[in-house]
Each structure stands twice: as structure tokens, then as C-alpha cells.
From Swiss-Prot:
SUPFAM superfamilies: SIS domain. Pathway: Carbohydrate biosynthesis; gluconeogenesis; Carbohydrate degradation; glycolysis; D-glyceraldehyde 3-phosphate and glycerone phosphate from D-glucose: step 2/4. The keyword Isomerase applies. Disulfide bonds: none annotated. Belongs to the GPI family. It is found in: Cytoplasm. Pfam families: PGI. This is Glucose-6-phosphate isomerase. One of its GO terms (molecular function) is glucose-6-phosphate isomerase activity. CDD domains: SIS_PGI_1 (cd05015), SIS_PGI_2 (cd05016). Keywords: Cytoplasm, Gluconeogenesis, Glycolysis, Isomerase. It is an enzyme of class 5 (isomerase).
Amino acid sequence: MKNINPTQTSAWQALQKHFDEMKDVTISELFAKDSDRFSKFSATFDDLMLVDFSKNRITEETLAKLQDLAKETDLAGAIKSMFSGEKINRTEDRAVLHVALRNRSNTPIVVDGKDVMPEVNAVLEKMKTFSEAIISGSWKGYTGKPITDVVNIGIGGSDLGPFMVTEALRPYKNHLNMHFVSNVDGTHIAEVLKNVNPETTLFLVASKTFTTQETMTNAHSARDWFLATAGDDKHVAKHFAALSTNAKAVGEFGIDTANMFEFWDWVGGRYSLWSAIGLSIILSVGFDNFVELLSGAHAMDKHFSTTPAEKNLPVLLALIGIWYNNFFGAETEAILPYDQYMHRFAAYFQQGNMESNGKYVDRNGHAVDYQTGPIIWGEPGTNGQHAFYQLIHQGTKMVPCDFIAPAITHNPLSDHHQKLLSNFFAQTEALAFGKSREVVEQEYRDQGKDPATLEHVVPFKVFEGNRPTNSILLREITPFSLGALIALYEHKIFTQGAILNIFTFDQWGVELGKQLANRILPELKDGSEVSSHDSSTNGLINRYKAWRA
């Protein structure tokens, strides 16, 4: 990958000039000028997904100049580097190959002179055999009963992805009850353990190194709880499996290393649901549906790696995001799925985006002088409409939004889905076009009221509009379409990082807090006052000690 400061390119300078021409142009004006705007600024994927980006503050010239930026920063070369197994995560000297985990074509992907696909397929086959034994009931717990509950213990990428996907695919789930424990707060595991039976519970401990503080603290508490009933340490092997690469530590914990499922250093945590970390997904929806998830992602991988930038959906969404973040000064993006099963989707890509592109140092090791990753947030519709949409509609901040919805629901109750989708369509229309003062006054006249007598209210009912949105309409949320949607966002994130000259696949920002926590932990063991920190931290620690005494 090349190390090019995007602001030093001629394309960036052209975009800055173009922004000066575009900053006061409204979405309403763009639609008024072009009756064919929707067809020009939308695209479908595999007849399963429609991406409408017409309600953005862009023209064909905007996209052309953004494409020039992608060319000048060698996005095509960056894509080729990732898919070919080059070590593009330079700060950790690692390849980035989550795409290999879903490489259903089985074409060789080489890292350090070795094709990784045989090992990928071997772990998949091992997960298939294990999951079929658990799901069928042929795997028995220490008292001879089949497993009824699965508890995934992990944090970050070892939790967010599997939890999001198992929730999104609940219509496909089997009889097993899935639980997820991530927080080192003892409340999290305590509440889960209240609802499971040690005789019929399987714990998945997801930690590559088997040393992650939060995960191993929870895993040891789970084992203690289990042994309080089971008694004999040998029973641990029937009720615990590991998603890890540290065979020694796994064995010492009491887990049979035959039930250790490996992954590789070229799998980043926040891109790991496709790996052994996805075992909880397989146990929830079955191996065949997991393969469909992989296949959907692989289809998007092929689209991303082979489609020209002008028609490449992840690239288009990434470029539009850069346009708002760097030229309009938009600091956030909202992800708003109109599907209750997708309620963890925004949280998943909050990590996916912010941990990937939340960097202020470029690939040359210099502080950037432009914007990198945005703040990502969101909640399912229509709940969000009754919470934070007020600010999106009438606040002082620009919040570009992605609206996501399925055309077909898994729960066709009465007219629920039509009402849900009527809101989905209405919100993007309202955000784009707003409501003028003239329309507000006419509405009063239609009600037989004189607008002049209501002048004190009229300004508050005006909507400026011109709020940008993308709409992603899926035919239906299936394992395949969900896989494609996740990969769409993954590649959008990669594209932005490549163009913005940052390392997307490391996360050094999570380290300092962990280091300091490890230093503070011994200081919390006794009641003596602490004076080794700044006055604020000392004061907080000492008050904590006083109150817990």
C-alpha cells in the first residue's frame, strides 16, 4: 500500500473547490433538476440489495472527483494488496485476510508462501462435526444429559459479531439457548448463570491468547460455578470449549485441546465472526446457515475486488462518507436498521469503524491534518424516531444516516411491516426535502386557521431538509444477505482507511488504558490511601476505598 497524504493530491484540491460550489446546493434542487436522479444514484446487488444514495448532497461531478481521489491514492492497489495476502497491517507485521475465511471459491490465498485455505477448511470441518454433535444431542454433559444452553464468553470482536449475527438470524435458530457474556462486571456473568443448568450448559471461551483479562476472569468464574455442582475437574472437558491458539493454557484450564478451535494472526478481532469465533453462530443457526453467511460475504468480496470503482458499492459509500466527514464537517454517521432482529448492527459497526479508523497518525507515522474515522451510532427504527431523530431533523449538526430495511419480514403480523416500512420511506423523504414555511402556513389554512395568529408557532414547524441519507433495502434478511451486508460495511471501512492513509487493522488505542488498569489493580487490594497518580485519579481511588470499607 502506498503512503499518500490525501490532502496533498490534486483530487483533494479539486474537491475543496467543488465543495465551495456545492455547499449551498440543496437535495431538493438536485432532484428538481434531474427527474432520473434515482436511477443514476442507486444500484442493486445480486437482486437482493438495493442501495439508494440519491438523497445525498452530491452530483455526478462530485462522484467523479471522489473517484479521482481514490485513483490518486491508489485504492485499487490497496485492494489488491489485501486480497493477495500482503502484510498491510504493518505495525503488527500481519496480513489481513478475513476474506480468506469466507473464500467459498477455494482459490489459493498465500501468506508467507503458504496457501491458507486448507487450514481454513479444516477448522470449518472441525466446527461442523462439533456443532452437529451438540445440536443433535449426541454430545452429553457430565450427567448424560444433552446440551440445552450455550454461553459465549468473549469481549470485543469475540462477542459483538457473534451476538449481532445470532440476534439478526433468530428466525433461523434451533432449540439451543444462546447467551453472551462480555463485561468483566460480575453482574454480567452472574445474571446469565442464574438462568442455566450446569448439567446442560456448554461454555465457549473466546480468546486468541487465552489471556484476555475480562474473558479469562469470566471463564474462571464460570468454571468455579460449574465445579461447585459437578465437583470433579475432569467434567470441565464436557462443558467447555476454546476458541484460541494457546493450546498450553487451554489444556491447563481443563479444556480438551481436541475441542480447541484455532484461528490465525491474520484474523483481526473485529473481523473474526467468520472464523472459529463464529462457533456460537453455528450452534445457534446450524452449519449450513453459517456457510450461507460466508457465501453472502464472499459474493460481496468478489463485487468489491472486481467491480470498477464507479459501480462498486462499498467504494461509493466510503467516498460519500469522506465527502461529509472532511468537507462538510460531519462528525458522526447514524446506522438505523428498520428490523428489530438487527438491533445490534449499529453497535457492531461502532466497533468495526471506530476501532479501525479512529486514528490520528497516518501510515508515515505523522499526525494527520484531516478527519479520519467518524463517530458511529444508531438504534433500530422506529424506536429512534421517538428518541433522537429530533436532532437529526432540526438540530444544528449534520448527521448522515444509513437506513436499512428488509422488504419481506420474518413476522408478517397484521400490517405491522407496512407501518414499519412507511416510516422507513417517510423519514428519508422528510430528511431530504423538509417542510417549508409556506407549507406549514397552508396546513393551518386547510384547518381553517389564520397563520398570522399562529406566527409564534410557525417557525418551529419548519423543517429545512437537506439532511443526507443512504437507503439500503434488502429483499429479506437471510444468512446470505446478512453476510453480504456485513461485508459491504467492512469494505467501506477498509476503503476509507486506505484513502485516508491510516492503518485500519491495528488498535493501539485500546492498550494504554489496559496498562494503567493493570498498574492500578494491586493498589485496590487494601485500604491504604493512594498518592501515586494525579490528584483526580488519587481522589477517585481513595473515595472508592472509603465507600467500600
